[in-house]
């Protein structure tokens, strides 16, 4: 299923991890993303309750999930978990999900936080911002989600 988004669509992005999920928010009109929060990944119930609250608050039109891969592009153990998380987001919240190769997003996030003197404990949310910004930067003028 493909859904065209309005030019001012709001997006939520996720950097999925076993212990924490970084979340960022962005907008198609401004093509900018910002780190939002870190959701503790305690268990499935807590994870989706917290994400549901974010979706209710920000009312995104679509979601973006970082896809972890080895440097050579091969999948690894977290790849399947992130895919499952994104598919569950789509199933639970009926929002289109797009995937972004997240290789080096955490490295870029740490470097950006250090350069700005920000707290290192925000790295997961900053990684989600990097993922979403990469997604926004790669969009043509008119984008359709799958």
Swiss-Prot record:
Coiled coil: none
Record's subcellular location: Cytoplasm
Keyword tags: Cytoplasm, Hydrolase, Nuclease, Ribosome biogenesis
Gene Ontology MF annotations: nuclease activity
Cited SUPFAM superfamilies: Ribonuclease H-like
SMART domains: YqgFc
E.C. number(s) listed in UniProt: 3.1.-.-
Gene Ontology CC: cytosol
GO terms, biological process: rRNA 5'-end processing
NCBIfam families: RNAse_H_YqgF (TIGR00250)
PANTHER family: POLYNUCLEOTIDYL TRANSFERASE, RIBONUCLEASE H-LIKE SUPERFAMILY PROTEIN
Function: Could be a nuclease involved in processing of the 5'-end of pre-16S rRNA.
Family membership: Belongs to the YqgF nuclease family.
HAMAP family per the UniProt record, alphabetical: Nuclease_YqgF (MF_00651)
Protein name: Putative pre-16S rRNA nuclease
Lineage of source species: Bacteria, Pseudomonadati, Pseudomonadota, Betaproteobacteria, Burkholderiales
